[in-house]
Amino acid sequence: MLCIQSTKTLTLNPLDPVERDFLSIYSIMYDGLMSINDDYLPETDLAEDYSVSPNGKTWTFKLKKDLKFSDGTDLKASDVVATANYILNKAKNNSGYYLNLKYFVSSISAEGDYTVVVKAERAYYGLLYAMTFPILPAHALEMNNPPGTGAYVCEAFHPGVALRLAPNPYWEQGVPQVTRIHVNIKPTAADVLSAYEYSGTDAIFTRSIASAQYKGGASSLALDYRTNQLECLLMNHSAFPLNLKSVREAIRCIVDVDKIARSYYNGMVERTDTPFISGTWMYDDSLSNYFRTDPVRAMSILEADGWLDVDEDGVLERLNDKGEYVELKMNLFVYEEPDDNVRLETANYIRDTLGAYGFKVTVQTMKFTDVQQALSVGNFHLCLASYAMDVCPDAGFLLMSSNTGNYCRYRSTEMTDLCKELRKQMTQPDYQRVLFQIQRQFAEDCPFICFFYRSGTVLTRRMYTTVRDVRESELLKGIDTFRTN
């Protein structure tokens, strides 16, 4: 018996999920052409193999034969094409969970029943990550609870109350090891935790900071999982004094991100110093000296750039172009999530810590929509915010000059060129090489500060998986093949 949080999911549609917990439900009901393994590398799933043309812009995927959807109909290339085109058509209006597919695929077609041909926007290794979207039958794209090829089917769903999963009678691997999954649905994170503590629930998914108290309990196992939510301290390069690299570097040296993770997030994070996932093939761990907490170095950097406490009021000043002293002052915008006030606590810590070293920081709590507006027009100094990172390891949208997520107004010809170069790579080693160059440029330029990826916890009374890399969208991965001794 599983318990999840949900208030918005009224129908089951894997192409348009509206709540994160349902992604894990869908992950054991539906499959993509490709999947991502424990090393965060793409591998074939419904596809048996694939090939790419010499110019890198035509990809050919061969489907496994004799696969069926849960309604007994055969999986054909036409189903893959119909699913992709459904996503691409919605993406024309910037809608749909998988809308980023439009940046990878220019067209898709079927050659016979078992061959899918994808014309790519560019020669780019990242396309393989984009081909992980769930495949549905062509006739069921807008159906509630459509057939899939995964290990389970939903045999009953009562929105806001419960759903029940049973084995897919046509699953290619036979009968899954766990043959019944009952899912209770609760409206709040607190209700989910209560269900685990008092109602005999076997497992829950939670991102609540309060769940840390259950870790290490004699009757519970805790599986930490990584979300795609990258928490950052954004710094506006178009606003004084953050247009000065010295000030940005000093902030990076003073703010103790490890303390934030430990004291305010209860360790429910996966630390990273760059926009990429640490501990994986994509992460350059040789850059740690750039990100070391060192207030002494911070003060040295500021002093070398002319910042002094001239009037001894505890706030640093510097001469501007007019020969006038200006203070080292800035605002810090923050918005809160409904379930906790951890960001506000973090903002207050940053204010107090920077204040001890001559910064004058004013924290302003705002509505999410107001922060969005401030970021879009550049009316801020500092902002605690998060990015929902795509499944493809490519941070160009927030690093390239004038790109959509570059709220910091960071301008670097070198970085933009590197991001463009990344999108020309066709092999994993070459892709990794350019990713490392991007991270070194990020470390040198200090455009903003990456804190960590938020994490959550699966609390369970019984182990059900051997997966090493537990990700938020696939929290039930492995339950279909797990064997108990």
What is each residue range found by the language model?
Residues C3-P54, N85, P147:
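N-terminal lobe/hinge region of extracytoplasmic solute-binding protein
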Residues N37, A123-R180, I185-D191, P295-S300:
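Gly/Pro-rich hinge or "lid" segments in bacterial periplasmic/extracellular proteins
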Residues E48-N93, P241:
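Aromatic- and charge-enriched surface segment that lines or borders ligand/interaction sites
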Residues S51, G96-A140, A156-H158:
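Surface-exposed binding/hinge segments that line
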Residues Y125-A130, W307-E336, M426-R461:
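Bilobed periplasmic-binding protein-like "clamshell/Venus-flytrap" ligand-binding domains
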Residues N168-Y214, K360-T362:
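Ligand-site clamp/hinge motif
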Residues N243-R351, Q437:
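Append "and occasionally in soluble cytosolic enzymes with long acidic Gly/Pro-rich linkers
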Residues I254-D285, V342-R351, L375-N485:
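Detector for C-terminal structural segments
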